[in-house]
A protein has these predicted regions:
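Short, aromatic-rich amphipathic segments at membrane interfaces
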Residues: 172-208
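Membrane-proximal low-complexity regions enriched in glycine and acidic/polar residues
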Residues: 74-168
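C-terminal soluble domains/tails of integral membrane proteins
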Residues: 273-431
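Internal/C-terminal transmembrane anchor helices
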Residues: 245-276
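Short beta-strand and strand-turn-strand segments in soluble, beta-rich domains
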Residues: 62-64, 110-127, 349-365
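N-terminal edge beta-strand
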Residues: 51-80, 295-304
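Juxtamembrane interface at the cytosolic side of transmembrane helices
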Residues: 214-256
């Protein structure tokens, strides 16, 4: 674009700004006031956006099993244990980075309300990242120490590189006491006992203050005189090849001084840190290997024939062929999809433990009798509950890859559990 055109555009902008009447600033001022005041009236967030995650992401990535968080009420300095199992789905979406590449066990909690004391998967410390194999089962444990009083919704989380956090089921934990009483010390490799809450705080404040002053001084030098911002841009366009004259000899001298001073500060900080902390350990970036739990023999085999979701009734229907190779009769007791547990109330009386516990106590309808040992039978189950709509799983019918994945749990008359992952295309029904 010709330089004259640039200059004309800039002049038009400036002329427009000059001719704005004071009465026109009223709506703008009101909008700015509402924007600034909004956070003061925003209600607190109760959870971590589980409903906002894509339905296929929740259904076809991780199956969380037997998640438990205990105790649910602790005081500051007391510990909370998050335990359970998870299984990466064999139907993992192909367009997403796989959990078999890089993953990390984490905890989802609002703010630094807890300190993680220990985390393990199958007994292996999870200080670093790892990888998890599809269709394999892993057992995890995370120990947290309460730091700040409040009521918190705690989730186990697996963070997958390139995919993001995959959130597990959650429970509310209440922390009582006073944060001033919180104590957390660690012993370094040299035997020094430190408090991470305040360690090297003086140095941190001084360094931040120094760089802040340097930045303000640099900006003040260039803003000390006109023109700046838009007027300066117009001036550069007007002067053309002579625009370099806007930068004076004192400007060059001050710039060289700032550059030299910053280099001296960086070098001085480097040598000071080496003197102050002569023994250091490099942050480790390698992965640890975690072997999956031994897989039990597949005594109950399942083949999905057809899966439909009836939109008017919020009913998910799966027709499947089941072969029972165990020694006892089995029956479907639970269907778990996207952290929602649909329970066969004829077998179990399981109630939600709190308002956000995703349990449909009578959401699983199984009309067939138990499947006998050695029998192969085609059965149909119905997972009916408003949670399909409440947690936006119905959006699956609008996705280009309308496939589902879930855990189906059979139980025999002695309470032995047999888990099967099922999945495949889901067909919406509007009738």
């Amino acid at each position: 674009m010709p330089r004259a055109v640039h200059s004309g555009i800039a002049e038009n902008i400036m002329n427009t700004m000059k001719h704005i009447r004071y009465r026109n600033w009223g709506p703008l001022a009101l909008a700015m006031l509402l924007t600034l005041a909004g956070p003061l009236y925003s209600p607190p967030a109760d959870a971590h956006g589980e409903r906002a995650q894509q339905a296929s992401l929740r259904m076809r990535t991780l199956h969380w099993i037997d998640t438990e968080i205990q105790p649910r009420k602790v005081a500051v300095n007391e510990t909370v244990r998050v335990t359970g199992r998870f299984m990466p789905s064999q139907f993992w979406p192909e367009h997403m980075r796989s959990i078999e590449e890089t993953a990390f066990l984490n905890i989802g909690v609002p703010g630094p309300a807890f300190v993680r004391i220990d985390s393990r998967v199958n007994g292996v410390p999870m200080i670093r990242s790892t990888r998890f194999h599809l269709a394999k089962t892993y057992e995890y444990e995370v120990v947290l120490k309460a730091r700040a009083p409040g009521r918190y919704h705690i989730h186990p989380v697996i963070s997958v590189e390139g995919t993001g956090p995959i959130i597990g089921p959650a429970f509310w934990v209440e922390v009582t006491g006073d944060q001033k009483d919180f104590k957390h010390t660690i012993t370094t490799m040299t035997g020094e006992v430190i408090n991470p809450e305040t360690y090297a705080m003086t140095s941190i404040l001084w360094w931040n203050a120094l760089w802040f002053v340097i930045g303000i001084a640099w900006l003040a030098w260039w803003f000390r005189k006109l023109p700046v911002i838009m007027p300066r841009y117009i001036k550069v366009e007007e002067m053309g090849d002579d625009a370099n004259k806007l930068i004076t000899i004192p400007d060059v001298i001050v710039s060289v001084f700032f550059f030299g001073f910053v280099m001296v500060v960086i070098a001085g900080g480097f040598f000071w840190a080496n003197y102050q902390y002569p023994i250091t350990s490099v942050l480790q970036t390698g992965k640890v290997e975690v072997e999956p739990l031994p897989q039990p023999p597949q005594l109950v085999e399942v083949e999905v024939n057809k899966a439909t979701y009836r939109i008017p009734g919020r009913s998910f229907q799966v027709e499947m062929t089941v072969t029972n190779r165990s020694a006892r009769p089995v029956q479907v007791g639970e269907f778990t999809a996207a952290n929602i547990r649909f329970i066969n109330d004829k077998m179990f009386d399981i109630k939600p433990q709190d308002a956000q516990d995703l349990v449909a106590s009578s959401g699983l309808r199984v009309e067939n009798p138990p499947i006998q040992p050695g029998e192969t039978r085609t059965i149909t189950i119905y997972a009916d509950d408003a949670l399909w709509e409440t947690y936006r799983l119905t959006s699956l019918i609008n996705e280009p890859d309308g496939r589902f994945a879930a855990l189906l749990m059979f139980f025999d008359d002695q309470g032995t559990r047999y888990m099967n992952e099922i999945g495949g295309p889901m067909i919406p029904s509007f009738g």
